[in-house]
Amino acid sequence: MSYEERANAHPNLGDESDVEEEALVNDYREQVNFDDSMSELDRTTSLGAGSQTQDLQAQLAAAATPLEYQATLETKFASYDNYCSLFHYILNSDGPVELEVPSYYWAWDVIDEFIYQFESFCRYRNRVARSGSNEEEAQLLRENPNTWGCYSVLNVLYSLIQRSQINEQLAAIKRGEDPMAFAGEYGSRPLYKMLGYFSIIGLLRVHCLLGDFSLALKTLDDIEMNKKAMFARVMAAHFTTYYYVGFSYMMMRRYGDAIRMFSHILVYVSRTKNFQKGGNSYDAIAKKNDQMYALIAICVALHPTRLDDTIHSALREKYGEQLHRLQHGGPEALPLFEELFRSACPKFISPTPPDFDNPSVNVDPVDHHTAIFMDEVKNTLYNPTIRSYLKLYTTMDLQKLAGFLEVEPEKLRSWLLVNKQRSRQVRWVEGGLLEGEPVAANDLDYALENDLIHVSETKAGRRLVDWYLRNLARVY
């Protein structure tokens, strides 16, 4: 969305000043040099100096350390057992565990690595079941169906949230009240507060991986999507949150909201790219950055809109010819939609163990969600062509338009009805992420009266004064 359009638009989530954004950028500059290795934990002085505390520090350090890519199945099992022991101790000890954590960067690493290992194990298990080539591993996985089980992972995340009472604290902050009055014995400890907070972001990610996009957004009801939120102070968490929120919106056909989410984080990344290089998570962020540009290209093709100048230029540079083909529509665009979706979507997982005895019945979750998305794309393939004809008329006969398109009139009627329904989208205004108001998705509307199509087009006026004022403020 351009600057002049933003002046007329509804207020964006977290529309703070450039001064606040600059402070956030400076905060990330410090984070790039943060070392969350074991040495950082060793330098931390805990409230309890006993061996038990040191053992817990070692476990926490291990939990934040990525597992080797080629780790054996036994190593993955052992890692799961270690996580179970760690979280059981934190959640079920007699009273809160007395331990100071280095920073919130580290707390994010623990939750992020926990979910990543769960995700990669589920995909590996599904791959073994579908291939049926390694009977030894298949038997081992068959005998341990609850290892890295969906229920266990969700139980940990929900338990950390409940124990820390982080939702109650966040709700109190939104009401302007003291969060410590709602924190309780556990939530007042930084260890529980940070793990509970980032478990909310973890739930967003897990529910999205499972394909429950509305529940994914629902988990963030008490988190405000702005630059002051705690997740915005950790680049990887900031990026992850906006990626999964934007993707959830896209799968719910709320393309305008998806574009807004992707644009927010991509503009921020463009401002920090000069000192991202050398950071521990640079490669992962660069990959996610490319994925979000692919997703925003899909959204713009399905929901034409103006973009921020920075995003528009980068999108043209990355997907110039491909973007033109997507926006043109037609059957030849289908393979490109699928290619971009597969390259940019999350690595979906199944909530249940696969059937090792019948490999042919196991479906790749990515294939499943790709098929669902492509069904939606097929319903809108001819929208650009139909739109180009309708823009030339105020009234048009259905038979005449069918002749131009070389299709049966009744088939065209179905397309028009589908397009009419898709032209109304829910757009966020205020409140939770799931809330919103139905709005017209584009400036072209029409109505069918028997075989007569009535067309109306509205164009919003450009408010250049606001655009100039906004850019003058940046320069001076």
Swiss-Prot record:
It is found in: Cytoplasm. Its main location: cytoplasm. Pfam families: Paf67. GO terms for biological process: formation of cytoplasmic translation initiation complex. One of its GO terms (molecular function) is translation initiation factor activity. The keyword Cytoplasm applies. InterPro entries: eIF3l, PCI_dom. Component of the eukaryotic translation initiation factor 3 (eIF-3) complex. PANTHER family: EUKARYOTIC TRANSLATION INITIATION FACTOR 3 (PTHR13242), EUKARYOTIC TRANSLATION INITIATION FACTOR 3 SUBUNIT L (PTHR13242:SF0). Belongs to the eIF-3 subunit L family. This is Eukaryotic translation initiation factor 3 subunit L.
